[in-house]
């Protein structure tokens, strides 16, 4: 007696039918994609700020910008954070503390340099003796965010760019792509000039006595300029 049933087709042409239970509960992906998705969706920034740029970063915590939708959870301990936003001027005295905070963060960790003072020294780069001319001389930087200070919308854009960078990383290349060196910024081209606020404007005639037209309109008896200056000098003495 022969078997009349057709043998099973190993490679059918038709599209296989997937049950509804499996179609709604199974995701086909790779371990690397899940690893990147989990990290970019749960960045935990360190609550760290040294100057006025931190006010703009703190504004993102409110309901208007609500950075919780990006999965950001602010942490007060560097051992629980994987993102540090250097918001504000970094001084020579603060530099060792910043490096120590960065070293205490677990890997993989990321850095966003926020503000002109953090990137190049900003307005303190020409004549300040204590400002660090670029935080990338201390720790490696992943995203540069210029501005004085940057608006919260710009901070959100920097976070989006960092998320894209994390999404393109590979779990097997994490050690090879890690930044192990520090960068050195170029010298600025600013020319220092003599200060304009020297205090000489206090001796201007307009500060010693009101204008004659204003004094005549208000009926104020204005003494001579020499008498006003002598009286001011005697009172100061």
UniProtKB/Swiss-Prot annotation:
Looking at the keywords, is Metal-binding present?
yes
- What is a GO molecular function of this protein? iron ion binding
What are the alphabetically sorted keywords of the record? 4Fe-4S, Iron, Iron-sulfur, Membrane, Metal-binding, NAD, NADP, Plastoquinone, Quinone, Thylakoid, Translocase, Transport
Q: Which Gene3D superfamilies match?
A: 3.40.50.12280
| Coiled-coil intervals | none
Reply yes or no: does the keyword Lipid metabolism apply. Answer: no
So which domain of life are we looking at? Bacteria
Question: Major place of localization?
Answer: membrane
According to Swiss-Prot or TrEMBL, what is its membrane topology?
Peripheral membrane protein
Tell me the protein's name: NAD(P)H-quinone oxidoreductase subunit K
Source organism per UniProt: Thermosynechococcus vestitus (strain NIES-2133 / IAM M-273 / BP-1)
The gene name reads ndhK
């Amino acid at each position: 007696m022969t078997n009349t049933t057709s043998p099973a087709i190993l490679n059918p042409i038709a599209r296989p039918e997937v049950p509804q239970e499996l179609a709604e509960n199974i995701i086909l992906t790779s371990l690397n994609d899940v690893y990147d998705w989990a990290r970019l969706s749960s960045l935990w920034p360190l609550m760290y700020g040294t100057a006025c740029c931190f006010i703009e970063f703190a504004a993102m915590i409110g309901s208007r910008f609500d950075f919780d939708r990006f999965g950001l959870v602010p942490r007060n301990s560097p051992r629980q954070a994987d993102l540090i936003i250097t918001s504000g001027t970094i001084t020579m005295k603060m530099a060792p503390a910043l490096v120590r905070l960065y070293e205490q963060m677990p890997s993989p960790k990321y850095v966003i340099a926020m503000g002109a003072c953090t990137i190049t020294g900003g307005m303190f780069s020409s004549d300040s003796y204590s400002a660090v001319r670029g935080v990338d001389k201390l720790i490696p930087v992943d995203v540069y965010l210029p501005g004085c200070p940057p608006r919260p919308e710009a901070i959100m854009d920097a976070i989006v760019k960092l998320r894209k960078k994390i999404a393109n990383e590979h779990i097997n290349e994490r050690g090879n792509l890690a930044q192990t060196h520090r960068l050195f910024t170029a010298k600025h081209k600013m020319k220092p000039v003599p200060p304009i606020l020297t205090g000489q404007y206090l001796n201007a005639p307009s500060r010693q006595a009101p204008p004659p037209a204003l004094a005549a309109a208000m009926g104020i008896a204005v003494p001579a300029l020499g008498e006003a200056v002598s009286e001011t000098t005697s009172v100061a003495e």
